[in-house]
Amino acid sequence: MMPLTMVKAGEENTIKEETRRFLENLGFVTGGVVTVVSEIGGNMIVNVKDSRVAIGKDMANKIMV
């Protein structure tokens, strides 16, 4: 398990239970696939459930994959 900020662009990972509740409304669900599209200064653009979502560094650090 690691924070999303440690994932390389193009790499798919599975979201862990710890961050589930807050992120469900954005489409992040436990067991769901998240793919990092790009990362600049810790801020990330990710694909989740066929949508692109921009998330800040602080939030990305809370998403465990």
Question: Where do the PLM segments sit?
Answer:
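Compact, glycine-rich, soluble single-domain proteins
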Residues: 1-65
